[in-house]
Amino acid sequence: MVVKVGVIGTGAMGRAHIDRLTNVLTGAEVVAVTDIDHEAAEAAVRDFHLNAKVYPDDTSLLQDPDIDAVFVVSFGGAHEATVLKALDTDKFIFTEKPLATTLEGAKRIVDKELTKSKKVIQVGFMRRYDQGIRALKEKLDTGIIGAPLVVRASHINPNVASNYSNEMAITDTLIHEIDEMHWLLDDEYTSIQITYPRQSAEVRNEGLHDPQLATLTTKKGTVIQVLVHVTAQYGYEVKLEVIGETGELQLPNYGLGPILRSNANQQTAVEMSWINRFIQAYNTEVQEFIDQVAKSEPPVGPSAWDGYIAAITAAAANRSQKDQETVLINVAGTPTFYQNKNAIHA
């Protein structure tokens, strides 16, 4: 079966997904696109040589009975409304993060999906598909370093767009680590605190504090510290270190070429964009989603519930930004519907 896909949003990320669906992966065909910028949608069809319809909006695209799955790749504030409308159809849904920009919006999506016969939503938390992070989790799960005691991570960007706000340090940047650590440790958060170190002189965005340090605690007692530094200038990096009872696991910043040692110096390249760093992870997550849709089986990747957990934690982090105090996190138990990766209602 060739999965027929409609893409909602043809900006940079939408075009990247169209490219991989059309030219890199197997089993899918982009048959419809839409964007609030109609010319951008037309350009995507033209540039990628698609045999696809261009719809004026998401509502009309979602009414197309020939579409098996939709990719929601619009700006974050539009995700909730589109996903809720998509849940009124029989289509599978791949939505980029965030699931919704508010806690209440994420809860509305979860509540609506719970009325369906099976899971249909996958959220684009691609970190789970990174080969290095997966390998680290596999090692951790063997118990080779004992129980995880402390996790240290960094999320470094060279710079950010002029519309990047202080809140987006959480909802656009830290959100990746929020989901990653929840999955990596198989644990629930109990609190989060955001603190502001010395302000970087490189910050140009009004109201933005950079860097920021997030400290999270979990039910099992692990303490997680994440440095978010989005005006670092020198490049893009993610770092991860897990300190256990009997050892440590570290994620190398791999894939950037050889390390050169010469004339008493050591050099290696530093990536400037997250796109190249995680291209393999994006390809793997989308291929897995397409393969599940082709079998008419529920997605096995990050679920709407995972998106809801991330939204709860992000909302607490945004509150902590205001006074840099610790904010408690209390999440109800995971519904049975979301406990089984292949959850289907009887």
UniProtKB/Swiss-Prot annotation:
Any one GO biological process: inositol catabolic process
Top-level class of the enzyme under EC nomenclature: oxidoreductase
Alphabetical list of PANTHER family matching this protein: INOSITOL 2-DEHYDROGENASE, PTHR43593
Organismal lineage: Bacteria, Bacillati, Bacillota, Bacilli, Lactobacillales
UniProt superkingdom: Bacteria
Family affiliation: Belongs to the Gfo/Idh/MocA family.
Pathway entry: Polyol metabolism; myo-inositol degradation into acetyl-CoA; acetyl-CoA from myo-inositol: step 1/7
Native source species: Lacticaseibacillus casei
Pfam families listed in its UniProt record: GFO_IDH_MocA, GFO_IDH_MocA_C
Residue ranges the record marks as coiled coil: none
SUPFAM superfamilies given in the database record: Glyceraldehyde-3-phosphate dehydrogenase-like, C-terminal domain, NAD(P)-binding Rossmann-fold domains
Gene3D superfamilies (UniProt xref): Dihydrodipicolinate Reductase, domain 2, NAD(P)-binding Rossmann-like Domain
EC number(s) from the headed UniProt entry: 1.1.1.18, 1.1.1.369
Keywords from the named record: NAD, Oxidoreductase
Function noted in UniProt: Involved in the oxidation of myo-inositol (MI) and D-chiro-inositol (DCI) to 2-keto-myo-inositol (2KMI or 2-inosose) and 1-keto-D-chiro-inositol (1KDCI), respectively.
Complexes and interactors: Homotetramer.
Record protein name field: Inositol 2-dehydrogenase/D-chiro-inositol 3-dehydrogenase
Residues of the signal peptide: none
Keyword Protein biosynthesis listed: no
Entries under InterPro entries matching the protein: Gfo-Idh-MocA_inositol_DH, Gfo/Idh/MocA-like_OxRdtase_C, Gfo/Idh/MocA-like_OxRdtase_N, MI/DCI_dehydrogenase, NAD(P)-bd_dom_sf
Example GO molecular function: inositol 2-dehydrogenase (NAD+) activity
